[in-house]
């Protein structure tokens, strides 16, 4: 068994990604052909569930782009289900300390190394027990990325980096800026200083730093500092802003007056 995303991180080669929030296998396949190294299937802020994650994994599978799946929480039950449908690389949100990082790793490993439940006969991940010796190979193929998104997590970064089985640490600029008192302003100098320091610290510890940043100069700056997995856009934003720009070129103005509410 191989995990190309994990192998590339270990080799120290940067990977450029795109965030998927449309929760749709058709758009996921469309974007899988765009050339990004990795695609993040978001279960935290997008309307995904295990079934929609499965269909997107199937849609991306024929393409070189590598899928990364973000569950809604650091929950071993949810993690087990995502691994069984074929996710190998997980991005665990809102990890605050080393204990939570250890819990995330344990949820991805079969016993005795962890607590992942054994159900390989039912699992796409094992090709329904068609992969020889899957139970003994699976642990090494798992890639665990944890998100640090608060001042508390930043203060615990050194101990998080010491946790065996953590392959990368992803800095969440939106939540971090809010926690630091600069909601909606991840480009504030204090936030940027925290991000840059974290990238350097993560890389120095032998782990892979990651981030989502649609601002192109900042994304390139993070890559220069040593970030190894950087998402540079979001599918919903590309679609919304692209459609708005096209409409504007023909003199069409946005009109939301008929919208009665969020429903």
Swiss-Prot record:
Residues annotated as site: Increases basicity of active site His: 84
Give the binding site residues for substrate: 147, 174-175
Q: Which residues catalyse the reaction?
A: 45
Supply the Pfam families for this chain. Answer: HpcH_HpaI
Query: Its annotated pathway?
Result: Aromatic compound metabolism; 4-hydroxyphenylacetate degradation; pyruvate and succinate semialdehyde from 4-hydroxyphenylacetate: step 7/7
**Site (Transition state stabilizer): residue numbering on this chain:** 70
Q: Which residues bind a divalent metal cation?
A: 149, 175
Q: Which cofactor does it need?
A: a divalent metal cation
Task: State the EC number(s).
Answer: 4.1.2.52
Identify a single GO molecular function assigned to this protein: 4-hydroxy-2-ketopimelate aldolase activity
Quaternary structure per UniProt?
Homohexamer; trimer of dimers.
What is known about what this protein does? Catalyzes the reversible retro-aldol cleavage of 4-hydroxy-2-ketoheptane-1,7-dioate (HKHD) to pyruvate and succinic semialdehyde.
Protein family: Belongs to the HpcH/HpaI aldolase family.
Which PANTHER family does UniProt cross-reference here?
2-KETO-3-DEOXY-L-RHAMNONATE ALDOLASE (PTHR30502), PHOSPHOENOLPYRUVATE CARBOXYLASE FAMILY PROTEIN (PTHR30502:SF0)
Q: What is this protein called?
A: 4-hydroxy-2-oxo-heptane-1,7-dioate aldolase
Origin species, per record, is: Salmonella paratyphi C (strain RKS4594)
Name the gene behind this protein: hpcH
